[in-house]
């Protein structure tokens, strides 16, 4: 699960310009472009350096909705989610690949098993072949690959977030309930993604692995913020969006790797994208089933997720040198992903349109409250709005000089931002 988000995926252009002391230089036009696109992909995290997070108060919560009504709605959501355990057993668990037939990172990398001279020679030859392919990969694609790998490596955070969703969580760590088995199986399959990308990058010799590893360390330490993390509705919607975004991101990276002659990397990203596609199918089907059972609750939850923006799982990544907001490492990485075509504003608009159509939001009628109908109207008009904003951002960007940024991941080499 990585996206520059969605994600896994992607925010906007930034202007962390290339200069020896890493100071920021930006034009007002570029800053406006960043803010516009940043609003499309994800809201800034509350816990930014030098700023206190908003404080939850009972008064604020009560102002949003009467406490008894909100609590009752949450209990109903949890019970509906729990009622799907048999459905999950029949429809979602078969999407997970049995371990004995699943691919493993070792399948795509030179064999490092100890042995005689022939084994060592074969390993050395395999690494040389991998490095020859990696040598042709442009720096902007490497930045996207590292950003996706860093996000994948923060898997412990995502499993802990999954276990906060009431009705879906693994309450004991070994629960036999289908929802819990799905979460553990999903985690096990996702764990291979970061492992495989990490080992490829290590063997490629193209990146500063210590800086990359320190970025993973910081992301795990910093954590992740998510709208309504205890809500099963929000959690399943978020999962569907994230998995589709990562499928798109890894798929585009595979295409770019192939175009630049790295067949090994193309195969690696392709097999990861295929996993994300299966996982997307699970979360999408589960969300679709909930739309059938509680169309009003799901329409309002989907609108909540869209209004709050789909916060990227890697949004709090840091290499220890970056700033806040448009100068953050995540914003710069996302700007490169936009320019490289790994994950773009157009992809995000297509993604929103896909789910609104897939869950038949426009066709919802019976059972919608006034708030549900307002959510429906908002959702059905969202994709066209995103596309208009994207077109405006690109017209503005065309009138300004592209910025450059240095990335510690690639030994401070400069890369052009979107």
From Swiss-Prot:
Gene3D superfamilies registered for this protein in UniProt: Ribonucleotide Reductase, subunit A
Transit peptide, residue positions per record: 1-70
Cofactor(s) recorded in Swiss-Prot or TrEMBL: Fe(2+)
Entry's cofactor comment: Binds 2 Fe(2+) ions per subunit.
Gene Ontology biological process terms, A to Z: fatty acid biosynthetic process; fatty acid metabolic process
Pathway(s) annotated for this protein in UniProt: Lipid metabolism; fatty acid metabolism
Enzyme class: oxidoreductase
Subcellular location: Plastid, Chloroplast
GO cellular component entries: chloroplast
Residues noted as binding Fe cation 2 in the record, renumbered to the chain: 190, 243, 276, 279
The enzyme's E.C. designation: 1.14.19.-
Amino-acid positions noted as binding Fe cation 1 in the UniProt annotation, renumbered to this chain: 152, 190, 193, 276
Keywords: Chloroplast, Fatty acid biosynthesis, Fatty acid metabolism, Iron, Lipid biosynthesis, Lipid metabolism, Metal-binding, Oxidoreductase, Plastid, Transit peptide
One example GO MF annotation: stearoyl-[ACP] desaturase activity
Keyword check for tRNA-binding: no
Oligomer status and interactors: Homodimer.
PANTHER family in the record: ACYL- ACYL-CARRIER-PROTEIN DESATURASE-RELATED (PTHR31155), ACYL-[ACYL-CARRIER-PROTEIN] DESATURASE 4, CHLOROPLASTIC (PTHR31155:SF22)
Family membership: Belongs to the fatty acid desaturase type 2 family.
Function summary: Introduces a cis double bond in the acyl chain of an acyl-[acyl-carrier protein].
Protein's recorded name: Acyl-[acyl-carrier-protein] desaturase 4, chloroplastic
Organism: Oryza sativa subsp. japonica (Rice)
Taxonomic placement: Eukaryota, Viridiplantae, Streptophyta, Embryophyta, Tracheophyta
């Amino acid at each position: 699960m990585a996206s520059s988000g969605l994600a896994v995926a992607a925010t906007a252009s930034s202007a962390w310009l290339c200069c020896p002391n890493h100071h920021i230089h930006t034009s007002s036009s570029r800053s406006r472009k960043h803010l516009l696109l940043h609003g499309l992909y994800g809201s800034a995290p509350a816990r930014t350096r030098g700023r206190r997070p908003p404080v939850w108060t009972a008064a604020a919560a009560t102002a949003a909705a009467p406490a008894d009504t909100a609590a009752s709605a949450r209990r109903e959501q949890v019970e509906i989610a729990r009622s799907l355990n048999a459905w999950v057993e029949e429809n979602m668990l078969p999407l997970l690949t049995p371990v004995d037939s699943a691919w493993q990172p070792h399948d795509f990398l030179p064999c490092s098993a100890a042995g005689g001279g022939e084994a060592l020679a074969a390993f050395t030859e395999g690494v040389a072949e991998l490095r020859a392919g990696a040598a042709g990969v442009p720096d902007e694609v490497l930045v996207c690959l590292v950003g996706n790998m860093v996000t994948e490596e923060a898997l412990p955070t995502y499993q802990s977030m999954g276990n906060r969703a009431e009705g879906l969580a693994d309450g004991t760590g070994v629960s036999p309930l289908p929802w819990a088995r799905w979460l553990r199986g999903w985690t096990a399959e996702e764990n291979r993604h970061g492992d495989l990308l990490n080992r490829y990058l290590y063997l490629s010799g193209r990146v500063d692995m210590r800086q990359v590893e320190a970025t993973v360390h910081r992301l795990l330490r910093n954590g992740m913020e998510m709208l309504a993390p205890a809500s099963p509705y929000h959690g399943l919607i978020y999962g569907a969006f994230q998995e589709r975004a990562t499928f798109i991101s890894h798929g585009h990276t595979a295409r770019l790797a192939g175009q630049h002659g790295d067949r090994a990397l193309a195969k690696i990203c392709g097999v990861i994208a295929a996993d994300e596609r299966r996982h997307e199918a699970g979360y999408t089907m589960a969300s679709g089933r909930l739309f059938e059972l509680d169309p009003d609750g799901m329409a309002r939850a989907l609108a909540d997720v869209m209004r709050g923006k789909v916060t990227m799982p890697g949004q709090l990544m840091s290499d220890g040198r970056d700033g806040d907001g448009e100068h953050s490492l995540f914003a710069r990485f996302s700007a490169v992903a936009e320019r490289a075509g790994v994950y773009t504003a157009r992809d995000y608009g297509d993604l929103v349109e896909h789910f609104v159509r897939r869950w038949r939001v426009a066709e919802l009628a019976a059972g919608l409250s006034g708030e549900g109908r307002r959510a429906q109207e908002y959702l059905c008009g969202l994709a066209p709005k995103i596309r208009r904003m994207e077109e405006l951002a690109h017209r503005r960007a065309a009138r300004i000089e592209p910025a450059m940024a240095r990335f510690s991941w690639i030994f401070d080499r400069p890369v052009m931002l979107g």
